[in-house]
């Protein structure tokens, strides 16, 4: 991920993990530590799952899809204008993205939902790695609305914009011990963007059955309450 300082470098293989020197990646810091896998090893492709589970990441159709397409057209035009008028388009996108993420988090915390325009704007801004990383730092998976937010945006995203919200949905599903749902979301992300780095990392964690508790330990230093935020570029 871009813009985040590397605090820990961990290699996971064969049910063991070992931390490496950040500045000298070839140097391990201690012996490999075994961990308890959360589930039996699974193939990279998700197995046959229930219709309800598959529907949780399936794209919307009909009038809902048409409404989102119209919303995206409005949002893209507005974002293009904003970027063109800004002396630093990347900085403008990051500023808008942070505001959109914070607004979505506040609204969902209060039990609300995002309308089509707000959804389209956030989804479009998540194409920025820096905005996606900011959203990732804001997502801890402690409440059901985290999963509901990112799954909803995954379903409403148009082709070419799915990877960001789908990857975040997969992350929250993994963190909340829903590996099959996480796998479906990650594969939606990779189908939309085969080179998506964070989705590839999540798929590896799922394939290794790495427990999400280990991720929390490693990610604790990157949380917003630790004072470490992705820098404005």
Could you describe each region identified by the protein language model?
Residues 1-233:
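Charged, compositionally biased boundary regions
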């Amino acid at each position: 991920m871009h813009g985040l300082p590397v605090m820990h470098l961990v290699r996971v293989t064969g049910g063991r993990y070992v931390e490496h020197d950040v500045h000298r990646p070839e140097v391990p810091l201690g012996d490999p530590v075994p961990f308890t896998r959360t589930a039996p090893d699974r193939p990279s492709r998700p197995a046959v799952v229930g219709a309800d589970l598959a529907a949780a990441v399936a794209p919307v159709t009909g009038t809902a899809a048409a409404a989102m397409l119209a919303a995206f057209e409005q949002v893209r035009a507005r974002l293009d204008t904003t970027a063109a008028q800004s002396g630093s388009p990347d900085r403008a996108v990051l500023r808008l993205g942070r505001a959109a993420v914070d607004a979505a988090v506040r609204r969902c915390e209060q039990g609300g939902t995002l309308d089509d325009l707000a959804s389209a704007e956030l989804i479009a801004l998540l194409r920025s790695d820096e905005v996606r990383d900011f959203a990732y730092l804001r997502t801890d998976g402690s409440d059901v609305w985290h999963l509901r937010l990112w799954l909803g945006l995954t379903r409403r995203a148009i082709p070419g914009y799915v990877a960001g919200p789908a990857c975040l949905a997969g992350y929250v599903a993994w963190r909340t011990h829903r590996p099959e749902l996480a796998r479906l979301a990650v594969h939606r992300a990779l189908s939309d963007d085969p080179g998506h780095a964070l989705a590839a990392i999540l798929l590896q964690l799922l394939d290794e059955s790495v427990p999400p508790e280990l991720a929390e330990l490693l990610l604790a230093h990157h949380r917003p309450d630790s004072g470490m935020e992705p820098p404005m570029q």
